């Protein structure tokens, strides 16, 4: 499946410009796009319904717009549903969501990322790491904290445009690569 990245970029920017710029609206739209992507990829009945030539485009639009009304999603996104159905673009909703999230992070000056530790961290350590990285980047960070014992020690911070790796595993890999090159 080839994704038309330029079309996805245009649609995501169109959504960003039409939706209110508050955190709740942007996160609601992001969740809605994620829901559409999961439904299309993992739910065969939904995919069959959307791709069926026997179901009119109006019925498809009505169904997806009813999902918008049931959720707390801004009404400004309804034009997007029309374009999705008319151009049969539900297959690229995942790419549109990724680009939308990137654009909304820029608007809100927030980085969403993953903070991975080798063992369960102390709250003070997490706060200190986040505070120092926020100071360097001049942006707020909303990390999702997880544990991966394969790191041996240290942590990894993965943001959309940055990976900060202070784990023992990466140090050992770098040392191994240097020894191999000798």
Curated annotation (Swiss-Prot):
Give the record's GO CC terms: plasma membrane; proton-transporting ATP synthase complex
Species: Hydrogenobaculum sp. (strain Y04AAS1)
**What GO molecular function annotation could you give as one example from this UniProt entry?**
proton-transporting ATP synthase activity, rotational mechanism
Under the heading InterPro entries, the entry gives:
ATP_synth_OSCP/delta_N_sf, ATPase_OSCP/dsu
Name the protein family: Belongs to the ATPase delta chain family.
Q: What does this protein do?
A: F(1)F(0) ATP synthase produces ATP from ADP in the presence of a proton or sodium gradient. F-type ATPases consist of two structural domains, F(1) containing the extramembraneous catalytic core and F(0) containing the membrane proton channel, linked together by a central stalk and a peripheral stalk. During catalysis, ATP synthesis in the catalytic domain of F(1) is coupled via a rotary mechanism of the central stalk subunits to proton translocation.
- Quaternary structure and interacting proteins, as annotated: F-type ATPases have 2 components, F(1) - the catalytic core - and F(0) - the membrane proton channel. F(1) has five subunits: alpha(3), beta(3), gamma(1), delta(1), epsilon(1). F(0) has three main subunits: a(1), b(2) and c(10-14). The alpha and beta chains form an alternating ring which encloses part of the gamma chain. F(1) is attached to F(0) by a central stalk formed by the gamma and epsilon chains, while a peripheral stalk is formed by the delta and b chains.
The primary site where this protein sits is: membrane
Domain of life (superkingdom) = Bacteria
Pfam families given in the database record: OSCP
Q: How does it sit in the membrane?
A: Peripheral membrane protein
Known HAMAP family for this protein?
Answer: ATP_synth_delta_bact
Keyword annotations for this protein, in alphabetical order, are: ATP synthesis, Cell inner membrane, Cell membrane, CF(1), Hydrogen ion transport, Ion transport, Membrane, Transport
- Name this protein carries in UniProt: ATP synthase subunit delta
Kindly list the places in or outside the cell where this protein is found, as annotated in its UniProt entry: Cell inner membrane
């Amino acid at each position: 499946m080839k994704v038309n990245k330029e079309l996805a970029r245009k649609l995501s920017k169109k959504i960003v410009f039409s939706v209110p710029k508050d955190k709740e609206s942007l996160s609601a739209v992001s969740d809605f796009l994620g829901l559409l992507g999961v439904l299309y990829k993992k739910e065969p009945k939904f995919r069959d319904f959307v791709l069926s030539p026997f179901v009119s485009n109006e019925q498809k639009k009505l169904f997806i717009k009813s999902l918008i009304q049931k959720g707390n999603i801004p009404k400004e996104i309804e034009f997007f549903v029309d374009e999705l159905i008319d151009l049969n673009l539900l297959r690229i909703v995942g790419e549109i969501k990724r680009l939308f999230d990137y654009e909304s992070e820029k608007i809100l000056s927030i980085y969403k990322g993953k903070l991975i530790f080798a063992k369960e961290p102390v709250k003070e350590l997490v706060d200190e790491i986040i505070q120092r990285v926020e100071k360097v980047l001049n942006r707020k960070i909303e990390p999702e904290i997880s544990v991966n014992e394969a790191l041996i020690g240290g942590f990894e911070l993965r943001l959309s445009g940055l990976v900060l790796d202070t784990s023992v595993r990466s140090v050992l890999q770098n040392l191994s690569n240097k020894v191999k090159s000798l």
